[in-house]
Amino acid sequence: MAEDISLCLDRLGFHKFSICGHSLGGKVAMRLACDFPKAVDQLIVVDIAPRTYPAEHHLPTLTALLDLELSKIESRKEADHALTEKIPNWAFRQFLLTNLEMKNGVLTWLPNLQILRRSIQFLSANPLQSTDQFSGPSLFIRGGKSGYVRNEHFQEIKKYFPEAQIETL
């Protein structure tokens, strides 16, 4: 994915750029900065650290979304109600439901959930190798209530991104 972005930006005439990514996009942005350090002017990573996360954490959510019988559901409100038992956190459900789209009168998921479930081990892995490093300006932004970027991750972040600043919202 990082190489695809680099090729696309190069074709569009962007030879020096800043990149910002959230979650999986943050992993791609980190990989891009390490692979193409001369092209990346600044790196901003939101709510993810350069580490492996437990893939099992996401499987119940993906299963709940895949088990939803969208052919019998007519609105996001109905989908929200149907997911309440398996995904009790209201705010998280609302976030997930932003990926639900009405196409020709039928609700469909924007992401390919089957591919996400099959690829979850790969997607949860640390995108960087032990020798990777980006020495340019880097900002890691974390949510105050999020568990994805914890204080104990700071040393690991600094290993890969020695100029990194970490901010909490």
Predicted regions and their residues:
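Active-site acidic short loop of glycosyltransferases
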Residues: G13-K16, P37-K38, S135-G136, E163
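Conserved serine/cysteine hydrolase catalytic core
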Residues: N104-F161, Q165-T168
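Active-site loop/oxyanion-hole signature of alpha/beta-hydrolase fold enzymes
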Residues: M1-C20
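Conserved alpha/beta-hydrolase catalytic His-Asp/Glu region
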Residues: E56, S71-N126
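Gly/Ala-rich beta-loop-alpha elbow adjacent to hydrolase catalytic centers
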Residues: G21-G25, A29
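Flexible "cap/lid" loop of the alpha/beta hydrolase fold
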Residues: M30-S75
